[in-house]
Every structure is written in C-alpha cells, then in structure tokens.
Curated annotation (Swiss-Prot):
Cellular location(s): Cell membrane
Protein name: GTP-binding protein yptV3
Disulphide bond pairs: none
Sites where the protein binds GTP: 16-23, 64-68, 124-127
Cysteine methyl ester: modified positions: C203
Keywords associated with the record: Cell membrane, GTP-binding, Lipoprotein, Membrane, Methylation, Nucleotide-binding, Prenylation, Protein transport, Transport
Physiological role: Protein transport. Probably involved in vesicular traffic.
PANTHER family: RAS-RELATED PROTEIN RAB
Gene: YPTV3
C-alpha cells in the first residue's frame, strides 16, 4: 500500500506547559528516538504517523504546541478541527499538573471546534520516580473527573508512548461523530466495520 494511502486522517494536539516533554513524546512516537537535549517549540510543530487500527489505515497529524505563555494566542488557533487532545504534565513538577486545569483545559473549552473530541491526560517522566510530585492515583482521579483517558509515559525509557496514541486512536474510531467531521479536518473515505476486535499496528 502506498505511504499516502489511508482511510482516515485525524488531527491530534499535544498541549501542556513548557518542559513537560511534548516534543520528546512526539519524536519518540514518530521516529523511535529520544533526544536528550531539545529546544523549546516556537509556535507549533507537527509530524505525521500512520497507524492501522481495526483494519483501517489512519494518518495522524500530530501537532506539538509551544507551552510558553507568549505563544498562547498563536497556539489557540490549532485547537480547531482536532479530533484528539493530549494534555501532558511532568510528574516531577506539580505546577505542570495544576496548569492542566487552570490553563490548558480552559483553552480547550474555548477554542475547540469538535464537540466530541477525545481527551487524554498523559503523565510523563514516570522513570524519575524518586522525584515524583504527582501520584498515579491523583492523575487517574483528575483524568476521570474531566472525562479523559489516562496514560503514564516515559519518553526517555520508551514506556507506553505508543500505547497512549493507540488508545486515543481506538477511542476516536469508536466515536461515530468523529468519523464524519470532514469539515473540520477528519477525512472519511469509508466506514469502520463493526464487530471487529480492536487492534493497532504501526506501519
């Protein structure tokens, strides 16, 4: 199958404070590498990844947004048309966890144009257990209260990074309204068959 042949295109947005590891998560997922030293994202960056789920080949355009305050007005425009939103915090910095509710989820509520968008909370840097300031239970409870999926990851240790995107994709595919959002970025070329066992592969 040609690289650009796919059944669906979905837009996924990574948001969170500067330094929580959004760019590292994205690079780990799309390129399979971890970059120890990365510069802060200026404005927005994006990468493309193809996954096959439930027999459907999906193109994910994953947008990595700047976490700095001075880029907030620029970042806001990128919420539009996103079928998936990943809120990332650093488990070793409680302020980044608290910022999800105080800042990022508020922005999502204001700027998102896809009512059924799937939300996920990702707790990153869990390999730094000795420095942890936010417990797993606290992260789970927060995600549940806000109607989000929840995954703990480590881009450095390559822990559950792929799992996070795979779970998000399966949930998107399981939401019929998101398969019909052609006007806001989702391209529907076929219906997802029912009754198939869930499964995801990278290709």
């Amino acid at each position: 199958m040609a690289v650009d042949s796919h059944d669906y295109t979905f837009k996924v947005l990574l948001v969170g404070d500067s330094g929580v590891g959004k760019s590292c998560i994205l690079t780990r997922f799309t390129s399979g590498i971890f970059e120890e030293s990365t510069t802060s994202t200026i404005g927005v960056d994006f990468k493309v990844k193809y996954l096959t789920a439930d027999g459907k080949r999906c193109k994910l355009t994953i947008w990595d947004t700047a976490g700095q305050e001075r880029f907030r007005t620029l970042t806001s425009s990128y919420y539009r048309g996103a079928q998936g939103i990943i809120f990332v915090y650093d488990v070793t910095r409680r302020d980044t966890f608290e910022s999800l509710e105080a800042n990022w989820m508020r922005e999502f509520d204001i700027y998102s144009t896809v009512e059924s968008a799937i939300k996920m909370v990702v707790a990153n840097k869990v390999d730094l257990s000795a420095q942890r300031q936010v417990s797993s239970e606290e992260g789970h409870d927060f995600a549940r209260r806000h109607g989000c999926l929840f995954v703990e990851t480590s881009a450095r240790a390559n822990l559950a990074v792929g799992q996070a995107f795979e779970e998000l994709l399966l949930k998107i595919l399981d939401t019929p309204l998101l398969l019909e959002t052609t006007a806001v970025g989702g391209i529907k070329l076929g219906a997802v068959p029912t009754g198939q066992q869930a499964g995801v592969c990278s290709c």
